[in-house]
Amino acid sequence: MALPRSIGALEFSSIGIGYQAQDEMLKTASVELLVARTICSGKYLVIVGGSVSDVQAAIKAGMGKGR
């Protein structure tokens, strides 16, 4: 497995919103899901990897869903 050239991370204050944003991120760009988990009570962390442009697109999509 080749290592991703870029990684991006988003932290959400709601597990439900984080899960929805994760889904949107993976549907928007060709990125690999590296980490998706709760990190403490009610918070959700998503880390994706891939090309720089794909990671930027995925992060933008995730941020839009998380608002």
Predicted region positions:
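The feature marks the first
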Residues: 2-49, 53-54
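A common structural junction motif
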Residues: 29-30, 63-67
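Alpha/propeptide regions of enzymes that mature by internal proteolysis
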Residues: 55-64
